[in-house]
Amino acid sequence: MCIRDRDKTIDRPALAKLVFGDQEKLSRLNAITHPNVKKEIFRRIQRIKEKGEASFIAVEAALLLEEGYQNDFDTMWYVYVDEATRIERLKEGRGYTEEKCHEIMAKQLPEEVFRKECSTVIDNHLGISETENQIKTAVESLLSLY
């Protein structure tokens, strides 16, 4: 199976099809990619700090808890949405089947772990304006600490 498009970029749906059904392949992919992702995240953070460009830095990436980022960051946030909404969004946004959605979600940490490890929970099922309000409140709270 080829996982490159004609322009030699990664064909993300093909890669997902290849690894999400095989835990060993997924683990190998994560072992290859995530150390490099982590290096790049911290390289960018260092550059931003050196330039004094921000009051705070937000990082959004897959597997933050699984890769131990909670030991590196001041705070962790969890953006929550119920399972039915997640499935609906994955089907609409990425064209996944319901089976594919369940397969992916079964490999993720349970919600309880995120709620335990993260200091802030953003409820993302109430619509974009309510989500924005929650984020604004959380950012203001964070900035008041520093």
Place the predicted regions along the sequence by residue.
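Glycine/small-residue-rich loop that forms an oxyanion/phosphate-binding "nest" at active or ligand-binding sites
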Residues: G21
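Small-molecule kinase domains that catalyze NTP-dependent phosphoryl transfer to phosphate-bearing small molecules
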Residues: E40-I41, Q70-D72, E92, Y96-L143
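A general structural signal for well-ordered alpha-helical segments in protein cores
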Residues: R12-A16, L26, K38, A58, ...
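ATP-dependent NMP and nucleoside kinases share a basic, alpha-helical "lid"
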Residues: F42-E50, F56-G93
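Short, small-residue-biased leader/transition segments that mark boundaries at the very start
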Residues: M1-I3
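Amphipathic alpha-helical segments that mediate coupling or scaffolding at interfaces
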Residues: L18, I32, R44, R89-L90, ...
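Residue-level signature of catalytic and energy-coupling elements of molecular machines
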Residues: L29, A58, I122
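Phosphate-binding/switch loop-helix module in NTP-utilizing enzymes
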Residues: E24-E53
